[in-house]
UniProtKB/Swiss-Prot annotation:
Species: Rattus norvegicus
PROSITE patterns to which the protein is assigned, alphabetical: ADD (PS51533)
Polar residues biased stretches: 1-11
Molecular-function GO term, any one: enzyme activator activity
Domain of life: Eukaryota
Name used for this protein in its record: DNA (cytosine-5)-methyltransferase 3-like
Start-end of GATA-type zinc fingers: 87-117
Keywords of this entry: Differentiation, Metal-binding, Nucleus, Spermatogenesis, Zinc, Zinc-finger
GO cellular component: catalytic complex; condensed nuclear chromosome; cytoplasm; ESC/E(Z) complex; heterochromatin; nucleus
Signal peptide: none
């Protein structure tokens, strides 16, 4: 079984360990198709079978000795018969602010803020950085369903599913998580009906960002992404994430790259499309250009209007504009006004040394959680560095751009065999 610290690959042939309990032996008849285990889920063939853990957490508890910490969750539910919706799943607090969007149970105000902050954060391996349930945890179990990016901490599975569950999972060859299982209940952990709808509603209602997120897409409904890339070609970044296949004639995503959009009109963009993602950027630092930096933003905004789907469309549509630290303060204020969202500053720090940074305007979820302002001294240092950089650097995969695109794995098909580390 793979974890964040000890990744492993799935065995092609092994005996599936079935730990079903009577209460979890059937799927939820009221769940919509997208939340049920599909009749033929992609990549989960018989020869790639995966282990399941469906424990019963109702082991004996001593009423005279109430536990401390998160252990109080099982005590309150099993001994005091408290409704789990009145307990924070993340920390065990009884000061519930709202309902947890993914699983039955409450969530307190501090944990709600942490949940929203970490929801779309990813590590270099392409999986989410924090536990799907409590948004913490140092060592995490990685769901090994090919199309899932979620992780779970040892504490959550032992407390909410049952003591010793983490050891059972760790001993398995492959493990699929509680949002991928065909059964909705594992111990105290009850997956919510229509949890993707619940997650979107929770984010839109409680999140600080004025930009609404799209409902995440079930793995078997995801389609290859169609990208319009302006001024800068992100072909390498998309391929390294698995969104584009390297071989020609494949069923992977598509990329339309346009360097000069001066004479591009709406009819041409509509003919090229439709698109799921529009990318644009100012020129990289150190490159000479006849255009002023503000020109790139205005042209990006113009083409973006041509590429947008109809207002009544439910299609997830994303856009991202990257400023390579060229826009003036006035330009940045104008960009905020036109794109109707604040900028996020992302830094590439390696070994405590600032390697690169950029400002990003986008509706891709999760980017604000990595916002880190640059000091004037840091920005000046980057400006100085680019004078000595080789233009060959532009041929490398941009790790900051890759980081921005990682959340799109929740919406579009990607090909795991093509994925490379950041």
């Amino acid at each position: 079984m793979g974890s964040r610290e000890t990744p492993s690959s799935c065995s092609k042939t092994h005996e599936t360990l079935n730990l079903e309990t009577p209460e979890s032996s059937s799927t939820d008849p009221d769940s919509p198709l997208e939340e049920q285990w599909p009749k033929s889920a992609p990549d989960l063939k018989e020869e790639d079978s995966m282990d399941m853990v469906l424990e019963d957490s109702k082991e004996p508890l001593t009423p005279s000795s109430p536990p401390t910490g998160r252990e109080v969750i099982r005590y309150e539910v099993n001994v005091n018969q408290r409704n789990i919706e009145d307990i924070c799943l993340c920390c065990g607090s009884l000061q519930v602010y709202a309902q947890h969007p993914l699983f039955e149970g409450g969530i307190c105000a501090p944990c709600k803020d942490k949940f929203l902050e970490t929801l779309f954060l990813y590590d270099e391996d392409g999986h989410q950085s924090y536990c799907t349930i409590c948004c913490s945890g140092h060592t995490l179990f990685i769901c090994e369903s090919p199309d899932c990016t979620r992780c779970y901490c040892f504490e959550c599975v032992d407390i909410l599913v049952g003591p010793g569950t983490s050891e059972r999972i760790n001993a398995m060859a492959c493990w699929v998580c509680f949002l991928c299982l065909p059964f909705s209940r594992s111990g105290l952990l009850q997956r919510r009906k229509k949890w993707r709808h619940q997650l979107k509603a929770f984010h839109d209602r409680e999140g600080a960002s004025p930009v609404e997120i799209y409902k995440t897409v079930s793995a078997w409904k995801r389609q290859p992404v169609r990208v319009l890339s302006l001024f800068g070609n992100i072909d390498k970044e998309l391929k390294s994430l698995g969104f584009l296949e390297s071989s020609s004639g494949s069923e992977g995503g598509t990329l339309k790259y346009v360097e000069d959009v001066t004479n591009v009109v709406r009819r041409e963009v509509e003919k090229w499309g439709p698109f799921d993602l529009v990318y644009g950027s100012t020129q990289p630092l150190g490159y000479s250009c006849d255009r002023c930096p503000g020109w790139y933003m205005f042209q990006f905004h113009r083409i973006l209007q041509y590429a947008r789907p109809r207002q009544d469309s439910q299609q997830p549509f994303f856009w991202i504009f990257v400023d390579n630290l060229l826009l003036t303060e006035d330009d940045q204020e104008t960009t905020v006004r036109f794109l109707q969202t604040e900028a996020v500053t992302l830094q590439d720090v390696r070994g405590r040394v600032l390697q690169n940074a950029m400002r990003v305007w986008s509706n891709i979820p999760g980017l604000k959680s990595k916002h880190a302002d640059l000091t004037p001294k840091e920005e000046q240092s980057l400006q100085t560095q680019v004078r000595t950089r080789s233009k060959l650097a532009a041929q490398k995969v941009d790790s900051l751009v890759k980081y921005c695109l990682l959340p799109l794995r929740e919406y579009f098909k990607y090909f795991s065999q093509n994925s490379l580390p950041l």
